[in-house]
Amino acid sequence: MTASLHIILDTDPGIDDAAAIAAALFAPQLDLQLITTVAGNVSVEKTTRNALQLLHFWNSDIPLAQGAATPLLRPLRDAAYVHGESGMEGYDFVDHQRQPLAKPAFIAIRDVLMNAPEPMTLVAIGPLTNIALLLMHYPECACNIRRLVLMGGSAGRGNFTPNAEFNIAVDPEAAALVFRSGLEIVMCGLDVTNQAMLSPDFLNKLPALNRTGKMLHSLFNHYRSGSMRTGVRMHDLCAIAWLVRPELFTLQSCFVAVETQGEYTAGTTVVDIEGRLGQPANAQVALALDVDGFRQWVAEVFAYAP
């Protein structure tokens, strides 16, 4: 199968990010052109190190650029309590000498977009700081973005505060800017990612699959978004799954606003499912997932990896 969709992946690895990066690299329908890192699950120095370790593990020459170390206006609040202090606890990666590109992520994204023969798809599975910086500094790049597919937000409950999902809550100002940008947005939030569970039976089969399966199994043993006994949630993998198997998702066009001011509600995505606010839709919001189909696709894409 010929790769047909050229993508840029913005990420904050992160254990479920590792699974998403594997899918982005090895799904035959995708052509990953650039990886950029952002502070989120852990510091940007750690997310960059983790992404470089993964690229070395897979012997991949995909370029990588380090991005924002802090949110636009706030101090970083990370998720080391979910992913471990390093962000990818549980596997001993081999030492390497790889380095990121000598330019920040938003400039690297700009360069790839402006040199592409046709608009590209951005995939953001961490806080939206780098995407906001791109749009702030180079608004002309929007014409070269086919769409933005993101993991973030929720039409209901949060996982970082009672109402806010982690990626949006870390940098709500960046998210608000992105949702106001006019980009075509597909939002894969907690409404679907909480359904994206890999079962214990699935997890137990990973080590026999290949080197990647062994590595991911080791990481999942240290992942605190679920457990090996009850299953683990693959939040970030949903964004990649939508690119390849959009029929697995039920989407609805909605107006989405990001709250930036509330003492208890900052980072909340206000998803106007019923159109009560009278605002035009600015996102396609995923509200349901074919879980069995998702698991089947994950098994297929992991099998493509070495």
UniProtKB/Swiss-Prot annotation:
CDD domains: nuc_hydro_IU_UC_XIUA
Encoding gene per record: rihC
Biological source species: Salmonella paratyphi C (strain RKS4594)
Protein name: Non-specific ribonucleoside hydrolase RihC
GO molecular function: purine nucleosidase activity
Top-rank taxon, per record: Bacteria
Family according to the record: Belongs to the IUNH family. RihC subfamily.
The enzyme's E.C. designation: 3.2.-.-
Classification via SUPFAM superfamilies: Nucleoside hydrolase
Listed HAMAP family: Nucleosid_hydro_RihC
Cited InterPro entries: Inosine/uridine_hydrolase_dom (IPR001910), IUNH (IPR023186), Nucleosid_hydro_RihC_nonspecif (IPR022976), Ribo_hydro-like (IPR036452)
Transmembrane segments: none
A Pfam family hit: IU_nuc_hydro
One Gene Ontology cellular component annotation held by this UniProt entry: cytosol
